[in-house]
Amino acid sequence: MIVFRITMNVIPVKQLEIMQTLISMAEPTAQEAGCISCRIFCDIEDKNRLCLLEEWKTRKYLDHHIASHRFGVLLGTEALLREPLEIQIFTVSRSEGMDAVHRIRNQKKSNISPTDGHGSLIK
C-alpha cells in the first residue's frame, strides 16, 4: 500500500477556496482505480493547515493519479499557500490494527518483555 500525504499551510483569506478545491477533488479521486481512500483533515490548532491523505493499492496507481489533470489543479493552488506544498509518499509493507493493540496490552499485563512485532526483544 502507498500512503500519499499532502500538507498545505493556507493563506487565511484563501482557506475557503482551498477547502472547496479539496472537497471537489476528494470524491472523484476516491473513485479512481487503485484508490483505497482519500480524506481531508484540518489541524485543530491551526484551521489554515490542511492535510489531504490518500491511500493507493500500488505506486503505479498513485503515479497515474499524480500525472492526472485533477492533481494538476491541486498543484495550481501554490499561490494560495503561505509555504510550498509538503508532499510525502510512504510505502507500507505491513499494517496492523486493533488486534495488535490488544496483543501488546495483554503482553504488558503478563509482564512479558516487549518485542518488535517480529519476535525480537526490544532493548
Regions found by a protein language model. Give the residues of each.
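Short acidic/polar alpha-helix capping motifs at helix-coil junctions
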Residues: M1-F4, Q15, C38-F41, I89-V92
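Short, well-ordered beta-strand segments in beta-rich or mixed alpha/beta enzyme
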Residues: I2-M8, R39-I66
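N-terminal leader/targeting segments and the first structural element of proteins
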Residues: F4-T7, T21-S24, P28-Q31, I40
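Short, surface-exposed ligand-recognition loops at beta-strand->loop->(often short) alpha-helix junctions
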Residues: N9-E17
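A structural signal for short hydrophobic/aromatic patches embedded in well-ordered alpha helices
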Residues: I18-M19, H65
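An amphipathic, aromatic/His-enriched active-site/gating alpha helix that lines ligand/cofactor pockets
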Residues: S24, A30-I36, E55-I89
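Glycine-rich beta-strand-turn "strand-cap" elements at beta-sheet edges
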Residues: I40-D46, L75-K123
